[in-house]
Structures are given as structure tokens and as C-alpha cells.
């Protein structure tokens, strides 16, 4: 015998489901702008700026070297890749990995991240669990096993309730991790409201990634430039332009007056 279908009151949609969605979305937007206000500017040294510009110059030479004469290309390549005194060969940078326990700025960034990400999630989640506790909000459109009951029915302990039903507390967490497409559409791709992306970065350690090794970047660029040959793209360009038939008939119109009077 089939179990009777559970019908929800329409007021639950108006006073529980939609408010949780709006509150979660607004908290994410506020968290995004608060993270922008608390974001500290990263200070770059003159050496870091100079190294980045050198890498850009080398990459531009590899991509657009075909538009300059071969002698000019070889001169620039010799400056970067000379075996004896080339820039990429003689330049060695000392890379000191920063320690979060000795760098006050890193500790400050960690504290700001906890304030803008973890604290609002705990406070709003606790408030929603206290305000909307005990409500069944919606049902997923496919059957689930009993293993999903602790995840989708937080705050509701009914053994006879189908695992496809979602409680109010679980509905909040589903919105926290399910509104990333809306945040990307409204706030942009790299926004501070995407809680799932922030948690993934914290779990993988990307939020405290060490700076790139400049020596490895120089070596990779040296190898790429060493494999680049000069392919003159403007060969016979003068003859090609002069050999084209120039149609000048359209420059003169027969209807134009030939005299002033």
C-alpha cells in the first residue's frame, strides 16, 4: 500500500522558503562588498615589478617577433638568452617563503577571512535554525536513500518521513552552496559571496599559496624563447602592396560640379 502524499501549506512557501532564499542571497551580497572594503592592497617591491615586466617583454618578443627584422629579433633574444651574460642566465632571485606566524599582514588577512566568511555563516545559520525550526520546506524531484536524511532533514527527527523532503535548516545550506551561479551573474566571476569557492580554496590551501618562484619563471621563459625561431611575416610585403590593382574610380564622381560658378 502506497503511503499518502504529504501536502505542504502554501504559507510555508511565502514565509519560510522564499525568506530563506532572500536572506541567504542578501547576506552573500553584503559579504562580497564587506570583503572588498576589508581587502588590503598587496605591496609589491620594485624588483617584483621589474621581473614581471621582463617576462612580459620576453613573451611579447616570442609572439610578435615575426614583425621586426631578423637582426632586431636576434639582438633582443641575445639580451635575454645569452649563455654567458643573458638576463635569464645571470639573474638569480632569492625566494623567501613567507611564514604566517611571523608576517602580521597574513595573520590579518586570515582574521578578515574568518570575519567575512565563517562568522556570518554561523550566525545566520543559527538564527535561521532557531526561527524556522521544524518546517518541511520542499522535496527533491527524485527518490533518495535513508543515508541522505541527516543531510537534508536537519532539525526534523521523523523516521517515517521520506528522505526526499528537505527541512528549513538544510534548505539554508543548500542555498549557501547553490546560489553561486546567481552570484557570478550579478557580482562577477571572482566574487566574495561564493561560499563554496572560498571553502574550496581554504581546504586546498590556495588562500595561503606561496608566491611563484621567479627563478623557475625565468628558466621556463628562457626555454620558450630558445625554441622560438624568427619567421619574417613581412617578406615581400612591398611587392604585394604595389602589385594590387588600386581602384581609384570611386574617388571621383561625375555628378560633382566642375566649376565654382
Swiss-Prot record:
Expressed in which tissues: Localized to the inner segment and synapse in photoreceptor cells.
| Cytoplasmic compartment segments | 39-114, 188-261
How does the UniProt record describe the way this protein sits in the membrane?
Multi-pass membrane protein
Q: Does the keyword Transport apply?
A: no
Q: What is its main location?
A: endoplasmic reticulum
Which SMART domains does the protein's record reference?
DUF106
Q: Where in the cell is it found?
A: Endoplasmic reticulum membrane
An example of a Gene Ontology cellular component annotation for this protein is:
membrane
Q: Which InterPro entries match?
A: EMC3, EMC3/TMCO1
> Which ranges of this chain reside in the Lumenal compartment per its record?
1-14, 131-168
Gene Ontology terms: biological process: photoreceptor cell maintenance; protein insertion into ER membrane by stop-transfer membrane-anchor sequence; retina development in camera-type eye; tail-anchored membrane protein insertion into ER membrane
- Provide the function of this protein: Part of the endoplasmic reticulum membrane protein complex (EMC) that enables the energy-independent insertion into endoplasmic reticulum membranes of newly synthesized membrane proteins. Preferentially accommodates proteins with transmembrane domains that are weakly hydrophobic or contain destabilizing features such as charged and aromatic residues. Involved in the cotranslational insertion of multi-pass membrane proteins in which stop-transfer membrane-anchor sequences become ER membrane spanning helices.
Similarity field? Belongs to the EMC3 family.
Q: How does it assemble?
A: Component of the ER membrane protein complex (EMC).
What name does this protein carry?
A: ER membrane protein complex subunit 3
Amino acid at each position: 500500500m502506497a503511503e499518502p502524499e504529504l501536502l505542504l501549506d502554501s504559507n510555508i512557501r511565502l514565509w519560510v522558503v522564499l525568506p530563506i532564499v532572500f536572506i541567504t542571497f542578501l547576506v552573500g551580497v553584503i559579504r562580497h562588498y564587506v570583503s572588498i572594503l576589508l581587502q588590503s592592497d598587496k605591496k609589491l617591491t620594485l624588483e617584483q615589478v621589474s621581473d614581471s615586466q621582463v617576462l612580459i617583454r620576453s613573451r611579447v618578443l616570442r609572439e610578435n617577433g615575426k614583425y621586426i627584422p631578423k637582426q632586431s629579433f636576434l639582438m633582443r633574444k641575445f639580451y635575454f638568452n645569452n649563455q654567458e651574460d643573458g638576463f635569464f642566465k645571470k639573474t638569480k632571485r632569492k625566494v623567501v617563503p613567507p611564514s604566517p606566524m611571523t608576517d602580521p599582514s597574513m595573520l590579518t588577512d586570515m582574521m578578515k577571512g574568518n570575519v567575512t566568511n565563517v562568522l556570518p555563516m554561523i550566525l545566520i545559520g543559527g538564527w535561521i535554525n532557531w526561527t524556522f525550526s521544524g518546517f518541511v520546506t520542499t522535496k527533491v524531484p527524485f527518490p533518495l536513500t535513508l543515508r541522505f536524511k541527516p543531510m537534508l532533514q536537519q532539525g526534523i527527527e521523523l523516521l517515517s518521513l521520506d528522505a526526499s523532503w528537505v527541512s528549513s535548516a538544510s534548505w539554508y545550506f543548500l542555498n549557501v552552496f547553490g546560489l553561486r551561479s546567481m552570484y557570478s551573474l550579478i557580482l562577477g566571476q571572482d566574487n566574495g559571496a561564493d561560499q563554496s569557492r572560498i571553502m574550496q580554496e581554504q581546504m586546498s590551501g590556495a588562500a595561503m599559496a606561496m608566491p611563484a618562484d621567479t627563478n623557475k619563471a625565468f628558466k621556463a621563459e628562457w626555454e620558450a624563447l630558445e625554441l622560438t625561431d624568427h619567421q619574417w611575416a613581412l617578406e615581400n610585403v612591398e611587392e604585394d602592396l604595389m602589385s594590387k590593382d588600386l581602384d581609384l574610380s570611386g574617388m571621383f564622381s561625375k555628378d560633382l560640379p566642375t566649376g565654382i560658378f
